[in-house]
Amino acid sequence: MGKIVFGGAMSHVLDPDYYQAACGDIGRQKVTAAMDAIATMGDRFVEKKADALIVVADDHMNAFSFNCVPAICVRIGKAVQRMVQDNAEAFDKVLDHMPVEYPLHEALGNDILEQGLQNGFDLALSWEAPVDHAFLSPVNTMLGKRPIPPLVPIFVNAFIAPQPTARRCFQFGQHIARVVAKSPFTVGILATGGLSHFPELLLGRVGETDTVFDRKLIHWMESGEHEPLLDLTADELHKTGSHEFLNWMVLLGAVSPARAEVRYFGELPRINMAAVEWRLA
């Protein structure tokens, strides 16, 4: 019988140089503190000796385009490549120092996809989509020079309306937990993104955050109050800059009813950063 043995969620732009340029010295200090906390989370993940690591993140119109934006997409196959761009955005330049190819856990990815389709989840699949900073910056920050286990990347449409609902993302996380429980694998799961910010897709609000809303989300996760999170609407997530919290909702469904333990929270003019862990037996 399989088991989810580790859960973590964190911001996914993890580059001191980027925050130095965007926010000055305080930006470098805070992202460095966040990265230190994430590396310590990695110590605990390594102790679990997981067979696979599921990573739930959003695409930044790198793997997909307006020709097709899947609500939820499972990356399947034997390996995945990191995104390579000639003129990468500043936050994607961090990829230049990371490995080019990563192993995938083919069996687990296929099970999540196939059993999901059999149980009412209209999932997309990809054999070729590359992964960007949203997937690889957290994984490499958490594990450093240590071996990276086979991954199962899952893309959630966080930005392009209509997005999946918070409740549906939570339900998909519950589906992941059921698939893992029926498997022979021990599994970690990461969700990435946030907290509140407005990316370049929303130019008029770049630089804004919503600390009050972020702290409310954290309180609900720490106390295990998932009902208010299930009722979050697309309008609420949009107004507060919390689009990427949909990734976290998938994780919450997978690890429920466990309560969150905050490892780092830091306010910046451009984004509020967090690193959160769920202690699972």
Functional labels for PLM-detected ranges:
Residues L195-P199, L203:
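A structural signal for small-residue-enriched, beta-sheet-centric alpha/beta enzyme cores
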Residues V55-H60, V179:
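Short HxH-centered metal-ligating active-site micro-motif
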Residues M1-A50, F66-Q171, K182, L202-A281:
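Flexible, D/E/H-enriched segments
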Residues R178-F185:
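Nuclease catalytic cores that cleave nucleic-acid phosphodiester bonds
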Residues A63:
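Active-site environment of divalent metal-dependent phosphoester hydrolases
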Residues Q174:
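Phosphate-rich cofactor/ligand-interacting catalytic cores and adjacent structured alpha/beta frameworks
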Residues D51-A57, I154, F185-L195:
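Beta-strand elements within well-structured catalytic alpha/beta cores of enzymes
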Residues H12, H60, S196:
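Short, glycine/serine-rich, charged loops/turns that create anion-binding
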